[in-house]
Amino acid sequence: MLSWDSLSHFFILYYNGFMAKIFIFRHGQTVDNKDHTFSGWRQTDLTPEGIEEAKGIGEKLKNEKVTKAYQSDLIRSKHTLELVLNGFHEGVDLITDTRIKERDYGNLTGLNKDETEKQNPEQYKLWHRSYNVAPPGGESIEMVEKRVLAFLNDVIPNFTKDDVIFISAHGNSIRPMRRYFEHITIDEMCSFEHIPGKIYSYEI
């Protein structure tokens, strides 16, 4: 989903022969992921498997001359980016931005997903994958999209020719990023499952 400001910026860049590359990836598997627990904004670090997934991202991107790298304030995003950059990239402009952090699951945070779904399947479905229904005390995907869109509209105009951007994000913040760049529908955005270790690449 592009705002008019970002569309205008896109056409200016296009006609000036501008080309920047953006690589977006989800953090590696965490302890909460492994245990099927709603993480939200709570801190949960990478498992040994998650560490290997992050190293795998780094191996795939080691030849990219990254100029800026964005992370959220959550340890799983930071740890993943640290492993991606380690040994391959030096002097990178490293930026922490809370707008790309995971969705706040509110009262669901720390609960087991399987048990929560079993107790109330229909309500679970609404909380988990609907666009505009937020769990008690938490965020809807629509609310996450608003802050992620604000982030993208702030940072993209500052990219310069030949910039290479890394974004270490989360499953629910990647959703609106993909909608922004790929022009997908709301239903498609809400239905995607983002696999740890997968890289989404874009050129603007």
Feature map (PLM): residue ranges:
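Short, positively charged and aromatic/hydrophobic N-terminal segments
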Residues: 12-15
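Extreme N-terminal starter segment of soluble prokaryotic enzymes
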Residues: 19-23
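Loop-to-helix element that buttresses phosphate recognition and phosphoryl-transfer chemistry
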Residues: 29-83, 87, 135-149
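Short, basic/glycine-rich phosphate-binding loops at helix/coil junctions
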Residues: 34-37, 121-135
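Phosphate-coordination/substrate-recognition cap region in phosphate-metabolizing enzymes
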Residues: 55-125, 181-195, 203
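Active-site-adjacent alpha-helix immediately C-terminal to a catalytic or transition-state-stabilizing loop
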Residues: 78, 91, 149-204
